[in-house]
């Protein structure tokens, strides 16, 4: 009716079951971004219930079974009376919640909830369906446990952070509940839930596992995929600004050394440079070869791309694996092993840190090249990318920041996995230190995103001196996107603000998306 108020349709949240099939990193990205409502599949419920029945039957017997009626670690040989089994599980969570340091980012904690539920849904852990329902309810309701970054040795699993993940289900600790920090008890009341009383083996199943390392790995891989595409775009823009040659990207060169990442990167560079007016404008210049930071982009970026691909494969195996101990098998056996050991993740997390640090290293060198100005004097590219230097410092200091971050990355890229300190009075005599690998990788990723942002904002400044000649279509599209929010710098100004703006463009994917609209996709 005319004049009546329009009724807004309620937002419909899409549901997704877990436990039927493996999860991919792409699916995890989509789940995080779309806020899907998760629930256990019927098949998973049956599988979990069967596993739980085995545990309950064995718990009634007289024998000692690790994780069910014994102590833990060096205390594994000490049998616990049947009347104390529930208290044993609560004590385990409380005693292992010893994390320190900064808080884990909320998106990573959400991944931990999801990955822990996925691991338990495989049916090897012997927990009740109710336990997994709690985890998924937390995920769906933005009930985010407060977890601290430090305290895990990466074997026996991520004990401390996973204990902090579990605490709120028992009514302990604090949570971020729908954006507000409140006590876990109050948050449970708002959800209409009672604190969970853990049964035999459930506490151990919740804290044994690699979900802290895995969540960091998934989160970083999602960011690194965009970072690699951004690095190619930055390299292409810098190449145009210093009148570099596209000859090193000729497909025949890379067919002669066909590492997949190298071949792919060279193809992306050709794609981004398509339609350039700058490239043919200096074909007869006296320059014979560009410096390595330009000429070897396919080899360096490509090697990082191959490291990403290897890590991607390893992580997708890990997030769909049983990393608990002991494991409960359908035949009725309970077997102790070492699937909680984080070595597979620790190695690839360290590998990724090295690869991403190299992206920052070569980006900073390209930035430095631009600041030297136009050595041939043909396109009037001024030193420090500003005409009136002396009075103005130009882009001198943004390079300092890039250099500082690049140097910090070199320290962070030292592999944590080469170290091990025995714990539990020698029972756990080799650990992966993969949790340290995980947290420092995220810092390397953040630093490298910033270095690329500085390169891109500087390359945009340089291109403006070369216009009206047009760069390649992909480069021009990204340049136009930068200029929507960062203007050409005629003189010194607060470059901190420009860096932050460029960083937002990098992390949002706005520059890559703008280029892809012009030349087609190149992110994958």
Tell me the role of every PLM-derived stretch:
Residues 10-36, 40-47, 51-59, 168-524:
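C-terminal auxiliary extensions adjacent to catalytic cores
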Residues 16, 22-57, 63-68, 72-110:
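Residues that scaffold, gate, or flank divalent-cation-dependent active/transport sites
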Residues 28, 92, 96, 108, ...:
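Short alpha-helical scaffolding segments that buttress acidic/His motifs in well-ordered protein cores
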Residues 66-88, 95-118, 148-170, 199-213, ...:
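FAD-binding core of FAD-dependent oxidoreductases
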Residues 103, 123-127, 229, 313-314:
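Alpha/propeptide regions of enzymes that mature by internal proteolysis
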Residues 123-150:
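FAD-binding glycine-rich core of flavoenzymes that anchor FAD
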Residues 124, 153-155, 390:
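Conserved, non-catalytic sequence blocks in retroelement Pol enzymes and Pol-derived host proteins
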